[in-house]
A protein has these predicted regions:
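Acidic, metal/ion-coordinating pockets
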Residues: 26-298
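Bacterial N-terminal signal peptides that target proteins for export
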Residues: 2-13
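A general, composition-driven signal for non-globular sequence regions
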Residues: 1-2, 195
Length: 298
């Protein structure tokens, strides 16, 4: 009897082990997350002061600009238009109008960039013609662009559709000062893609603007919005990742409803056109992985 019981027990264990192996073999492996690399304010000079070799200017950081999406805020234009309506026909002095040749778009692409945000205070530095040339140059280089009024840019990453919407406190961009309109635009983006990334060019500027106040922020008398209020509204409306730029310093991050908000990624590249004294010289490349339905993974 003891032998029979033991034999039956052994058979039962063997069957259970076999079922466990089959179940494990049949279980689907977790799908990898979608990877992003993101940086803040980016330009490769300001004509006529340009790098001697623009093709190698970003070589030292190329290895960090790796992800299924590589994102930056284009703090300037890609144009050969030389007259700036913003500065009364010229740039310099206390008026800042930034441009590099349209051909520089290919250097951004070679460095790894796949998406650039144009919703900022420099996208119209050289008027409508300058902006149109910028958009065309990015397109020709294979870089997606976002940030114009009502614009939703959809790309693919990791086999999923990813929508980008850029906001800044200006009427010539998708405005972050009009919360109802912004909410509608983000919801539209969420209906068009699995993942929604919202870029915000918001908040005060300078070394004393490192902290998110939770209130309306201003710079030189200009309303730069309430970054925290806007970013959290964006998440509630469907954003899965919020990427901030504009203050020219690094700011904090938070996880809100399982979504990452990076309030400012600081200065990334300026070729002597950004102040880099003290905290203004701190930069970063943000590496993020999101689950395929949006939540922050790592």
């Amino acid at each position: 009897m003891g032998y029979v019981r033991m034999r039956r027990a052994a058979i039962a264990l063997a069957v259970a082990a076999s079922l466990l192996v089959c179940a494990t073999a049949g279980a689907a492996e977790p799908r990898p997350g979608i990877t992003f690399a993101a940086v803040g304010d980016t330009m490769l000079g300001n004509s006529p002061e340009l790098p001697a070799d623009p093709g190698t200017y970003l070589d030292a950081v190329k290895g960090q600009l790796r992800g299924e999406v590589v994102f930056g805020n284009l703090e300037g234009t890609l144009t050969d238009v030389s007259s700036s309506p913003k500065c009364g026909g010229s740039s310099g002095g206390s008026c800042y109008a930034f441009r590099t040749p349209p051909s520089y778009a290919r250097h951004l692409a070679a460095a790894g960039f796949t998406v650039m945000n144009d919703a900022n205070n420099h996208s119209y530095d050289f008027g409508k013609a300058g902006l149109e040339q910028t958009v065309a140059a990015l397109h020709d280089a294979g870089i997606a662009q976002t940030g114009l009024p009502g614009e939703i840019t959809v790309t693919k990453a990791g086999g999923e559709k990813v929508a980008f919407v850029g906001f800044a406190p200006y009427s010539l961009t998708a405005s972050l000062l009009d919360l109802p309109a912004a909410r509608k635009l983000i919801r539209r983006a969420a209906r068009r893609a699995k993942i929604v990334v919202v870029a915000i060019h918001a908040g005060a500027e300078g070394s004393d603007a490192q902290h998110v106040t939770g209130a309306e922020e201003h710079y030189l008398g200009e309303d730069r919005g309430n970054p925290r209020k806007f970013a959290r509204m964006a998440v509630r409306s469907g954003a899965d990742l919020v990427l901030g730029s504009g203050p020219h310093v690094l700011r904090g991050m938070e996880i809100y409803r399982d979504r990452l908000i990076a309030y400012s990624l600081g200065n990334f590249s300026g070729f002597h056109n950004f102040a880099t004294v003290g905290d203004l010289g701190a930069s970063a490349v943000l590496h993020v992985s999101l689950d395929r339905d949006g939540p922050f993974r790592s």
